[in-house]
Amino acid sequence: MPADRDDPVQPNRPDSPCPVQSAPAPPRWIDIGVNLTDRRFALDLAAVVGRASAAGVDRIIVTGTDLAHSRAAIALCARMPGMLSCCVGVHPPVAAAVGDELLPELRMLAGNPGVCAIGETGLDYDRDHSPRARQREVFASQLALAAELQLPVFVHDRASAGDVVAMLREHRAALVDVVVHCFTGTGAELEALLALDCHIGITGWVCDERRGGELAGLVPQIPADRLLLETDAPWLTPRTLKPRPPRNEPALLPEIGRVVAGLRGCAVTELASRTTANARRFFRLDGD
């Protein structure tokens, strides 16, 4: 009897009759828009970030919505630099509350570690919490600052009647990159933004059977290299989850990815790989 007759078959040997197949790597994601400084995350922030990591979310971009929240976002990034980056900016509902201090303060904040974009900035004519003329002034000043600092811009556009597109068109040549986050616009608006080489952020709005139908039809039209995913947590919890969690959080991003992949007719792993690469490129995260 040959000496090695009773040796067990080694599954990883080239001559093994039953080679072990490596399990596919689980999808990895980047959530480009989370309001982690919101008070609803105050009591369990570490657990929220931990659940996101366990769900395959490798990086969270914390949204800055005013100067105080931008400072808080920077502080969070200092606590969890391996998981968090942030934007600094003033979003349209509070545009009337800022004055001459805005640009010097934002310029200083943008120099902090972890800051990867200017925003959230833009226009919101749906709620009109600030006068529209003041919204446009504050948006224009932040676009100019982003151009000066050569940082990408994280844009809010809600019912702006084409004014966001018009202002982006005016400034686009000087801007390095633009994402219109939580896109909920029309096909014509999508076409105009793509013509300006903008990225498009898709949230759990696409999972909402009551109001997400038009967006669901547009998702396949977004070029693969322009697509980014976000939860916009704690809002916009995906309604496709049953039971529906009481609060959205970045650990639920894979559900948005699942729905988007289905709409685009691609594998979830393919979508995760592509949108993660897009986010790393957009926010200059290649050093992670």
Region roles according to the model:
Residues 2-288:
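Mid-domain alpha/beta scaffold segments of enzyme catalytic cores
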